[in-house]
Amino acid sequence: MPSSPSLLHKALIVCFIAFSIPAFVQNKADEKKQIAVQMENAMVNNLLKPWYPASIDTLDGGFLSSFSYDFKPTGNQDKMIVTQARHTWSNSKAAELFPNVPYYRAGAEHGFKFLRDVMWDKQYGGFFTFVDRKGNPKKGGFSPKEAYGNAFAIYALAAYYQMSGDTSALNLAIKEFRWLDKHSHDPIYKGYFQHMQRDGTPIHRDAKTPINAELGYKDQNTSIHVLEALNELYTVWPNPLLKERLSEMLYLIRDTIVTPKGYLNLFFHDDWTPVDFSDSTDAAIMKHKELNHVSFGHDVETAYLMLEASHTLGIKNDTKTLMIGKKMLDHALDNGYDNSVGGFYDEGYYFKDKPGMTILEDTKNWWAQAEGMNTFLIMDKYFPNDPHHYFDKFKQLWNYTQTYLIDSVHGDWYAQGIDKQPQYKTMLKGQIWKGTYHNFRAFMNCIQTLEPDTIAPPIPTDLKLDKSTASLNWTPSPSNKFTGYNIYADGMRIGYTPLTRYDLPKNIKGKTLTITAIDMHGNESEFSNKVYLAR
């Protein structure tokens, strides 16, 4: 048996490896660390601090939505389910990232109570789309119930449970999933109907529906955010029907909604035939362009959401989803990106009588740039030598964001890049469609990709079965970061809790039970000791 190398020999090997690493690799690693520091500072001090706790409505519940450019509350403060859910989600995630900052956890609980007590329709179920500041339902140009908004409610409730362990939040998320699946899911053609009456009846198009109205169509935006919501819920509630619907949405988006060229069709008839005006005159196309254009921001966002769902579903070697996601980013980069200063344009179109892509709107909204940075880094991880030079594009887009989107004086991001629309310097910072969700999520994901935390929490110990209460109890994982626990029965994941007690379902008998510790980045420990629940 060969002897172990000496300490000097080991040191020489380490030195040789270090000096053998090309300078550009070291420089790239240094750049990543530097940008991660910049992003964390921007995330905490420029984004989260201006919003929280200032946006908490201590008078009427929920969150204030409308803020002026210098972060003063303005307007009537009507409340939309999407905004309220997103703020609840952001506070839940911030509480995991920064457990020593008490107002994030308090803000998440505050948001959950508003969703539960005000936005939930106690008569018919489901969440109202739009209410006034005091919680009275309003039309506001929306359908009474919408799948998009109800999906974000699931998203928020699952995140709040993941952070808090409040089972009433998980139960409401499950109740909402079942309500949405009963009323909005299409059992024939799959997917979900977006528009619903208050009682959950889907609204279909008829002869009176204006031709340029979204009402009654299925759409990509609802679909990708239903996917996202089901993904979030599945991480804490691994239910078979939920898994089936999550898989269904992934394959529907990837294989039907994404076109062969690599962009999303936007609106659809019930059978997923696209709403398409490309055979019409240019004037007709422009009249209906809100229903039929290329949205580069949604394309780069969807590339990420598909990969996230594939990972959550545990699909091994899913090269098909990866390559379609890459195609979507490449298409947006080749056709809808400003190579001179950076930034994804808002809208493009393929006219049949014109070569290539025509840019309809060369403006650059804030959320597309946030999503773009995240997806650039994902593709750089998988394809570091790709001729698109994803990391260089990421750096350019981050520089663009710092220069033309981030308001270093008053906080947060402008709604549109001021290289194209300087008037946005003094326009609203917050409104029902603009909170912290897109850029906060992008910051979290980018920082984790730039400086990956790949260390799993320590294994939880002393797992015990309390037969009198049919519950598991254990000693927590001694980790200095937020840690939750996955529950397994005969090797299959059956649940999650951030607490150190889990009440077992009634059907879990005759099973061997064990747990793992898992952090917010998905790093999971080895299994704990095992216990057996007899029949």
Description of each model-found segment:
Residues 451-480, 520-535:
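Pro/Thr/Ser/Gly-rich low-complexity, intrinsically disordered linker/stalk tracts
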Residues 26-468, 487:
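Glycan-recognition and catalytic cores of secretory/periplasmic carbohydrate-active enzymes
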Residues 492-499:
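Short beta-strand segments within Ig-like beta-sandwich modules, predominantly Fibronectin type-III
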Residues 1-29:
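Bacterial Sec-dependent N-terminal signal peptides
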Residues 504-524:
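Beta-strand-rich modules
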